[in-house]
């Protein structure tokens, strides 16, 4: 990825009102409708980050965040061209994602309305103005009531939506030329949030899988390969972190394969450039799985599952929290489990005495 060398976007050059251009013009809007649904939805999320080996920048230049309360996720990729000026673009990306998470959290606490990812991006950009560098960014938010995924993207990060092991939707990227993406930054040639492309995927349904990633993912793996990973993975499970790890490691393997035909190689050939194999880069993957929630608490049985993780040096600690709404009564159960890898099956039913029973099976 190289830094853009374009006229400034903040009034020092011409203002572009056409879609997708640098400056104050608003980016294009894309809308995709999938299938009808009736339940309120929510996301459970997990991530995997594999920075490329660099002793000077062990944290890499990617960053991401997950805000479960706001049902919002995002990724950013600092533009590596800044290294020639002695600037760590990873600092800009990390600051941008940190401010984005704070903004999303603040919106959720002050309003019950769905989070607007464009507002999150704009405020994060403004709050990150004191940091030198530039970065791509892609932020997604779920409107639980409408069952709609709303996203904004600047640059060559992006996301895909999978249903029944098939890719239903893939976002487009923003590039001025090969390997020269749009990028947020306060530098000459930097873009502002208004240039972001906007996406809306309507009528998601339970079981849909959203895969969000930086160019380190998208340059090294095709949608069909992610489909293969999802098929091989036990899709009935809800460990999004594990699925993200599988996808990221598949992309890493491809990036190191000099003989693999990669998306990056194909784009290079279209641009008249010579490149063979994958592209070594930081790889960030965020996986979100769509689940159904029950709108009416007066239904006989309602269950909510959340998994809290604390990653230690050798093992992971899991705490399962089950909440039941049985008629007007409410009960909560905490079931700790120290298994490094957890599999669970959970079922509850109501018998003639109006009692709920629960079963939990854990296996290492």
Give the ranges of each region predicted by the language model.
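PP2C/PPM-type serine/threonine phosphatase catalytic domain
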Residues: 1-364
